Amino acid sequence: MKTVAFVLAPCLLFSAFAQSSPSAGKMSDNPVSTQTTDLATQVTAPDWGSLKPSPLTGEWERGVQGMLLNANRFALNAWYCDRKGFDKQDSPYLDFKGRAEAQIRPVAHQVFGLATSLKWNIYDPVITGISREEATRRTIRMISSLAHHHKANQGKTGWGDAWQSALWASQAALAGWFLWDELDASTRMELTRMTEHEANRFINYKTPYYRDKTGKIITPGDSKAEENAWNSTILVAANVMMPHHPNWQRWNDKAIELQASAYSAPGDWNLPGSINGFPFSKLNGSNIDPDGTVINHNILHPDYMTAIMGSATNAWIYCIGGMKSPKASLFNGNRVYHALTDLLVKDGKTMYVSNQGQATATMYYPQGNDWGNNRQANYWLMDIMADLFHWDTQSSIKGHDWARARQQEMQAMQARTTTGQYYQKRDEDTFPSREEWISYHLAFGYIGLWLHQNKLVEFTDAPLTPPVAE
């Protein structure tokens, strides 16, 4: 299939967490669909010739690569064969044994991590024990199965249209987009149908808020911050994959609104002007407190403060698609990061714990944490973003120092076995998909560091337009 190459614009370059209650926002009733036999021809693959993916340079950066490859080793061996039994299934499409989060989300996370290693040319069969050819075959088989079993291709019996399926679909879509040149025609068709279907759901979606403009709490204990962030991801995936789709502008408009609203604070609606074409005056509420903290699961929840990366990772996806990155993707990231590092929340303590002025890997949870107290990957990725996006200008200890302290702990945790498995005890992280969660955080960390190291980075606050064909 012939694809159209686009001029690669430099771009400035990042978790979704476990279940929040489904949004009351209204989904689109009648989006424009182009589900015809030629829908896949609208996809433009990344311009890898201009991107020139290659290994990161630098000792610390190579450590990031090593962690991702260890996660790949676990994914392709103990996870794929022993946990999932996929190697024992001989039908063309894998049977996931269900269509809910527990069956779909883990696979979506793993294919994103694997596709990143494969396409960025860092995959190493010496580390994983699986040849590149077999790793590619397994990854594509999982991608094609995710797409095939989606409602867009199976009707009511498929997965999708769920509380967080936008995130799962976006990671499957992006993995397929990375490996587009290696997909067969059927997988391309079903992948684009899945992507279009999930994106179209949000065209007329009513953006939800935790607090309205009068200060009334609409959803007590349940910020819509991370929900708006992860829902934006499928719209961005659709935009970069299908730059000439008739719904491109509608997808874009909703993606910008969701990203701007995700971590909006009280009073942001009074800011002058607009961000990427979305007027601040159209914000209908807020999802974070004025001090940058987030209330979710009925507590002040640091984990959901880092979920801003659901929006911020979009900045890198736009970049890979040859577009400038919108500032909306990072809106209020500096406010949230400063709260994590320096805000005194209880008994004179900060959520990020230092020792004699030095960064550590320890977190303080002022009201507890229902996911366990030994999570590192989300804070590590947040620290990388703070460094790359300059969110840490007012932090007493800088993002790169926090990231290095956490990475040391992460490498030690991963080194406890020879399988690449990260967690050894459930109480380290009670989230069921914790290993898969690690995989996609490491992949995004690698992508972001690589894009910055190669200076493929530029932000804009202007309205976005599709990339221009050569």
Regions found by a protein language model. Give the residues of each.
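Non-catalytic carbohydrate-binding regions of carbohydrate-active enzymes
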Residues: A265-G277, G322-F444, E458-A469
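Bacterial N-terminal signal peptides
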Residues: A5-S15
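Aromatic-lined, polymer-binding surfaces characteristic
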Residues: R99-G333, G368-N378
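Low-complexity, Ser/Thr/Pro/Gly-enriched N-terminal "stalk/linker" regions
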Residues: P22-N121, P125-A147, W269-N270, F278, ...
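Extended amphipathic alpha-helical scaffolding regions
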Residues: A75, L94, T195, A403-M410
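Long, compositionally biased, intrinsically disordered segments
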Residues: N30-A40, A45-P46, P53-M67, P92, ...
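Conserved adenylate-forming
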Residues: F444-Q453
